[in-house]
Amino acid sequence: MENLFCPICGSRRVSPAANGIYMCASCDNAFSFTKEVTYAKTTADIYKASVECVLEINTIAGENESSGTGIVISPHGYVLTNAHITGEAMAGVGNMKNYCDVIIAGRRPREILFMAELIYSDKAADLALLYCAEAEEMPALKISYSTVKTGDKICVIGNGKGEGLGIVDGIVSDTCREIGGRKLMMISAPVTTGYSGGPVLSADGEFIGMVTGGRDGETAMNYAIPSVTIRKFLASAEKKAGIRL
């Protein structure tokens, strides 16, 4: 039992239920290590199970302040977000170079502000990896290996307009849309400024992508980086930055 962990949130607070089914005391999800378990989840269920893995991110570049979202993807304090969120703020000079503010769990008005350091970035993929010591031992979202289909229901958690974490839902409008040389997933969820860097979650609560942007005035035409691209980025980060996720 000491080697078991929840495949959804990463917690080790796992206990057997019945017939090969296990329960996680941290996220209240049921799962099996030997067979697929299917059950309906509400948007509220998905939010409850995943929100502790999502952070608010605030960056300042000169007089410009911007907000976004980050995802805890490792219990070692590593946070995934968009490169366009960290770009200008983390290209500064002096003691603040390569740092930005993060709000743990975003429980406004009880937010806790910490600093995060830029570890690795890929501007072409619009992905950045941060390190925040205070995020160590936090539950982490595990990247899904499931096949995503056009029409699948999804939810997105994000820091909309910089006003705190919230959740919106929609569907996968297209699993592969080429935009600016990148292969992205198109989603109908009405994400706004600040949702960039937020996780796209399947109807089962699996982490299948991350918001990267949308079209001005087209709230039902937004784009997400698919999980396969995220996995490649993280593998590159481990190799080139010499870290272990």
Regions found by a protein language model. Give the residues of each.
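Catalytic-histidine neighborhood of serine endopeptidases
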Residues: 67, 74-124, 135
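Flexible, gly/ser-rich surface segments that form the specificity/activation loops bordering the active-site cleft
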Residues: 42, 88-91, 120, 139-183, ...
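Short metal-binding segments enriched for Cys and/or His
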Residues: 29-38
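A conserved glycine-rich beta-strand in the N-terminal activation segment of trypsin-fold
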Residues: 41-43, 54-78, 82-83, 112-115, ...
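Short cysteine-rich clusters marking metal-coordination/redox-active sites
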Residues: 6-9, 24-27
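Short functional micro-motifs and their immediate structural scaffolds
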Residues: 14-15, 32
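C-terminal cap/linker of serine protease catalytic domains
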Residues: 39-47, 92-104, 114-118, 138, ...
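Catalytic nucleophile loop of clan PA
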Residues: 71-72, 190-211, 223
